[in-house]
A protein has these predicted regions:
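Conserved PLP-enzyme active-site core in the AAT-like
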Residues: 1-241
């Protein structure tokens, strides 16, 4: 997605900025975080990064792509309007769009999705992936290269970065099964699992609220976070340890 001199714009809590052990830097690329505080990459914050990074021309890392995730790191769900707004901004700056879809099934089956669909994501993103391990599978994600210009190079990048498995078909079988159309014409297993996970998470949230726990933020996905006191934290740690 990026040339050597380019970087990727993301939120401060974006997975590639926090939880990938410097993997992007190890590949010779730069992460350019915004000042967004809610996990959603906004056009306004992305524009500030763009203006700063392009203010000195060739002397600074130039943005070449944006990174978003659905759901976000804290369980936020992208709806159609918010998604189109950041994609419109990226298109206006000729930037590639990558969506981290580790929890895409949860996001798209959430009541907060607001009309966003997998087909629409495929039309707007340069590349994205379909989460497997966070939706009932043993391992793996399915990378979708939507931009035709990127497809020819991807197999070589996959091999170079040790992403080609000798028995890789075993990963594909999971997705083939998960997306198979049921004989009764119902919803594919991939989406059934996500809806079930969301429903269970919302039941858990309601139960935690009844017990007096305060949600860290509102979330209609299978990610639920709560604020706890120091004493409660110690009690949880004692059980976990």
């Amino acid at each position: 997605l990026l040339e050597d001199w380019e970087g990727v714009i993301c939120t401060p809590d974006g997975h590639i900025n926090v939880h990938e052990t410097g993997a992007v830097a190890a590949c010779g690329r730069t992460v350019l975080p915004t000042d967004d505080a809610d996990g959603f990459l906004s056009p306004e914050a992305a524009e500030r990064v763009w203006q700063f990074q392009t203010s000195c021309g060739r002397h600074m890392t130039r943005p070449g792509a944006i990174y978003i995730s659905n759901t976000t790191e804290s369980g936020g769900v992208w709806d159609l309007a918010r998604f189109d707004a950041i994609c419109d901004w990226a298109d206006g700056h000729d930037l590639k769009i990558f969506l981290d879809g580790a929890r895409i099934a949860s996001g798209l089956t959430s009541p907060a999705a607001g009309g966003l669909t997998l087909e629409h994501i495929a039309r707007r993103c340069s590349a994205f992936y379909l989460g497997g391990t966070k939706n009932g599978m043993l391992m793996g994600e399915a990378m979708v290269i939507a931009d035709p210009k990127l497809k020819a190079a991807f197999p070589y990048v996959q091999k170079e970065r040790c992403g080609l498995l000798a028995k890789g078909r075993l990963l594909g079988v999971q997705f083939e099964t998960a997306f198979a159309q049921p004989a009764d014409g119902g919803e594919a297993l991939y989406w059934q699992l996500a809806r079930s996970a969301n429903n269970c998470a919302l039941k858990l949230r309601d139960g935690m609220v009844e017990l007096g726990f305060e949600p860290y933020r509102h979330s209609d996905s299978n990610q639920q976070f709560f604020t706890v006191s120091a004493a409660q934290q110690q009690a949880f740690e004692a059980v976990c340890n």
